[in-house]
Design a protein with these regions (language model features):
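Flexible interdomain linker/hinge and immediately adjacent N-terminus
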Residues: 1-11, 85-91
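C-terminal catalytic core of Y-nucleophile DNA break-rejoin enzymes
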Residues: 56-75, 81-103
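Basic, Lys/Arg-rich DNA-contacting stretches centered on the C-terminal catalytic core
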Residues: 1-2, 9, 17-18, 49-71
Length: 124
């Protein structure tokens, strides 16, 4: 099943309904075009305004630019190792946890399209 594009208003509703940490993950997808799996696996030591990443799916190397405001928000909640720590000690947040929260938020606003974290990447 493919994800669909969201109207700006719908995207804002979904973002507002997410937990703060999952909202931040989706904002990174929105601002950078990265896949959710690549975002949640960012390490704290890699957090700079501009950095290189090897995309997990395509194995392509690309440069990522993070706006200062977003970078500051990520650093404020980052763990010792992972930029987006998970519930389990020593692990990063899972893409499935972000996916479930996005689905819940879309249902709360009765959005009919198939919404997933990938929907935010499509806007990039």
């Amino acid at each position: 099943m493919t994800t669909e594009y969201l109207l700006r208003r719908e995207m804002e509703h979904v973002l507002a309904a997410l937990t703060p940490s999952n909202r931040l993950v989706c904002r990174v997808c929105l601002q950078t075009g990265l896949r959710v799996g690549d975002v949640v696996s960012l390490k704290t030591r890699d957090l700079k305004g501009q950095f290189w990443i090897v995309e997990a799916k395509t194995k392509k190397r690309r440069r990522v630019n993070l706006p200062r405001e977003l970078l500051g928000q990520i650093r404020a909640q980052a763990g010792e190792v992972w930029a987006f720590p998970g519930r389990r000690p020593g692990r990063h947040r899972t893409r499935q946890a972000v996916w479930a929260d996005v689905k819940r938020a879309a249902r709360a606003f009765r959005i009919k399209q198939n919404v997933a974290p990938h929907s935010f990447r499509k806007v990039y």
